[in-house]
Amino acid sequence: MIELKRLKLINWHNFENVTFDCARLTYMIGVNAVGKTTILDAIRYCLTTNRNFNALGNKKSGRTLQGSVHAKQRGENAYRRPGRTVAYIGAEFWDTVKRTNFVIAVRVESEGPMQELHPGDQTWYISEDGITLEKLPFLDPRTGAPSAKEDFKPAVGRLSYTRSPSEARDRICRALGIGRASSPLGKKFNEVFQMGTSMDEIPNFREFLYQYI
């Protein structure tokens, strides 16, 4: 079994540098607009490359990837980070069979909240076994700012990367023991993960049970 153990967010909406512990069953409790859904957005984006952030309770919010990176506030065109911003999401896993950790991460670089992202602005990373969040330099130790692309690598060990969302989905599915993203199980993983974290209504629950469960 592969378990999500910790999640790290750098410059993701109102989270500037936080690390969450995760368990097999994790509750996220809080008042509205405290950031629960943005955490789910981060997990979904990191593991599936899906940028559809508008969940059932926030259809009018118009949440976007750039909005999360630049920390869009409730006011129109109000952002906590209006200029060039780099964000990181890191998910640390534990493989119970191999008895080792590994990390899946994504880096986003955006020039501004209204600027369209370029193909090279998103980079997904998958570490080799034995890497934890602490072994990856999410922040530049000299400046405290998010690390540059060329500096985001462990001191010991390797880190593969891709800027292609489709290639990232394929590599992530393989790292999680699912196989290719285009396989029947890979397709179901991406579909069900979206359903399970978006809070969208399931139109036909019986069909959902028969098809996915």
Predicted features along the sequence, with ranges:
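Post-Walker A helix-loop "phosphate-sensing" segment adjacent to the P-loop in P-loop NTPases
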Residues: 45-57
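Active-site-proximal structural scaffolding
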Residues: 21, 36, 82-84, 202
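N-terminal membrane-targeting/anchoring modules of bacterial envelope and secretion proteins
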Residues: 48, 88-90, 99, 190, ...
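Extended, Lys/Glu-rich alpha-helical coiled-coil stalks
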Residues: 143-213
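Pre-Walker A-like glycine/lysine-rich segment at the N-terminus of P-loop NTPase domains
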Residues: 1-48
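Nucleotide-state sensing region of NTPase/ATPase domains
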Residues: 62-174
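A short hydrophobic beta-strand->loop->alpha-helix junction that borders the nucleotide-binding pocket
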Residues: 58, 93, 194-195
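Generic recognition of flexible, low-complexity loop/linker segments
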Residues: 17, 77-78, 194-197
